[in-house]
A protein has these predicted regions:
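Alpha/beta catalytic cores of nucleotide-metabolism and tRNA/nucleoside-modifying enzymes
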Residues: 1-46, 293-385
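An N-cap/entry alpha-helix motif that binds or orients negatively charged groups
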Residues: 1-70, 178-237, 373-375, 381-385
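A generic secondary-structure signal marking the coil-to-beta-strand transition
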Residues: 46, 68, 72-76, 125, ...
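Short, conserved beta-strand segments within well-ordered enzyme catalytic domains
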Residues: 49, 64-66, 75-79, 105-107, ...
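Short, charged beta->alpha transition segments
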Residues: 60-69, 94, 107-119
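Glycine-rich active-site/cofactor-binding loop and its immediate structural neighborhood
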Residues: 72-111
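Alpha/beta enzyme core
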Residues: 83, 97, 122, 135-310, ...
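A gly/proline- and charged-residue-enriched helix-loop-helix capping module
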Residues: 100-122, 126-140
Length: 385
């Protein structure tokens, strides 16, 4: 199937599965343990129904949304993804470029394979910087400084990785972070010569570029990745440390990985301008609820004191409209963007965003919503569900 014939995210996934080595595809696609959380993220959306309202003039539809004082063209953005470069060389900057062209947010992970400085140069108004706390407070402080020096508007602190999770697909495949060229990886790669050729031409397995500046001299090509592996996760991360980050950052602060309404309230009290409801795409706790399931309770808990964003399981335009009807301002998705890149490079990334924009537009017309301000609990069946 060519990229032009991919009609939805599942089609992109199918193409990517053929083109990527199994170890890489499983790293992107997989969840934790039995992957019940991964499945729940999708079934949660399927439990809701959108209620059409007809005889509404929907000849002109506007899916733009205001968030943190900026107007974005669509109610979705690109989730942060570490080691994204394994799917396609240079994909982090392709994502930044595509986000700028589509005018949607791009959340760059500090575990990415390009620097935040490079992303900010490509997409200065669309790049948000997502960081994990480390066990080295000097690096924590410097990551915030780098975002501040670049005049980025939004800093995202991910809090749902207190310890490493039990990703059994990765363990079975011999996947490591940072990636190592093991015999199993080498043999699997032989079945995907084009994937191998891309990395040979681009200089090899991608490094964690954001961390290179912190690596000791002489520590090797991906010394930053090795250092990252020793300093993360940070099980000692607390609300006090989040407040410390807030004190060093004057821009928008968003806390990612919130599921508890009480934690959402605490985040707002700590100075957060927004929270991202997320279970890390089903990659941390297999028994965790879907972010969509907790969305109504979180909105009730924090009211309008902060913005609510949501990721984990968003695959259709109808998913986005359901989330907005329940109180989210904007949704995020990640895996489909890497599947698009693996399927078609830069064109595949653009195609993924275009697919979602088209679906949102169609669903808005179908349910009688000419602009997103018109959607609410009345757009669901049963009403208020």
């Amino acid at each position: 199937m060519s990229i032009d014939r991919a009609l939805n995210f599942d089609d992109l996934r199918a193409i990517a599965k053929r083109k990527l080595p199994k170890i890489v595809f499983d790293f992107v696609d997989g969840g934790v343990e039995d992957e019940t959380c991964l499945a729940r993220n999708r079934s949660a959306f399927q439990d809701y129904r959108l209620l059409p309202h007809y005889l509404v003039d929907v000849s002109k539809r506007d899916q733009s949304v205001s968030l943190f004082g900026r107007r974005y063209n669509s109610p979705f953005g690109i989730s942060p993804m570490g080691l994204a470069g394994l799917a396609y060389p240079g994909v982090d900057l392709l994502l930044a470029k595509a986000a700028a062209e589509a005018n949607v947010p791009y959340l760059m992970s500090n575990a990415s394979n390009a620097t935040i400085e490079a992303a900010a140069a490509v997409a200065p108004h669309n790049t948000w910087f997502q960081i994990y706390a480390t066990t080295d407070e000097r690096i924590n402080i410097d990551l915030v400084r780098r975002a501040r020096d670049l005049a980025l508007e939004t800093l995202v602190v991910t809090v749902d990785v207190p310890v490493n999770s039990n990703r059994e697909r990765n363990r079975r495949n011999g996947f490591s972070r940072p990636p190592k060229m093991t015999l199993a990886v080498f043999l699997e790669s032989l079945l995907h010569p084009r994937w191998v050729a891309r990395f040979i031409l681009s200089g090899g397995i991608p490094a964690m570029e954001n961390w290179g500046v912190y690596a000791p001299p002489g520590s090797g090509r991906d010394g930053g990745g090795d250092l990252y592996g020793t300093l993360t996760p940070a099980p000692s991360m607390t609300w006090a440390r989040l407040e410390e980050i807030r004190s060093r950052w004057s821009g928008n602060l968003v806390v990612k990985g919130i599921l508890s309404p009480a934690d959402a309230v605490r985040a707002v009290e700590a100075g957060a301008n927004g929270v991202i409801l997320s279970n890390h795409g089903g990659r941390q706790l297999d028994a965790a609820p879907s972010p969509l399931d907790v969305l109504p309770a979180v909105r009730a808990a924090i009211g309008e004191r902060a913005e609510i964003l949501l990721d984990s399981g968003v695959r259709r335009g109808s998913d986005i409209l359901i989330a907005l009807a329940l109180g989210a301002r904007l949704t995020l998705f990640g895996r489909p963007m890497l599947f698009g890149a693996a399927a078609g490079g830069e064109a595949g990334v653009r195609h993924a965003l275009a697919l979602m924009r088209r679906e949102v537009d169609i669903v808005m017309g179908q349910i009688g919503v000419p602009e997103l301000a018109a959607i609410g609990s009345h757009s669901l069946w049963p009403p208020g569900s």
